[in-house]
């Protein structure tokens, strides 16, 4: 987008249905999942395909609203099943090295409907 261009960075984006999108095998150095709230079964499937799609040493950077975000009014889905728990998400990356894990409150400024103190879960993992 415009921010990347202004910084002289090339970014390729795709709009796709994650239920069927082919991420490939050992194709990516990094995968970013920011506030991508999926039903648990689909999330597990997408994460498994994501790890398979990483090259050795590749990383996944993940952030989503945690279970305690419900009712805060600062963003996130209103369905409890779409919110995540850190321990649950850790288990979805078996065999990966955890580089960063956090569950707690932080200020979120992602636009008009996602602003204020939010309970987030962050995880950065590396494929061996």
Per-segment meaning from a language model:
Residues 19-30:
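A short acidic, Gly/Pro-enriched loop at the edge of an enzyme's catalytic core
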Residues 57-65:
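Conserved beta-strand signature within the Rossmann-like core of class I S-adenosyl-L-methionine
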Residues 109-128:
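Core SAM-dependent methyltransferase catalytic element
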Residues 38-50:
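A short, conserved alpha-helix within the catalytic core of class I
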Residues 7-18:
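Conserved SAM-binding strand-loop segment of SAM-dependent methyltransferases
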Residues 49-54, 93:
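Class I S-adenosylmethionine-dependent transferase superfamily signal
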Residues 19, 37-38, 64-70, 104-106:
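Short "lid" loop at the C-terminus of a central beta-strand within the Rossmann-like core
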Residues 80-103, 121-122:
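Short alpha-helix
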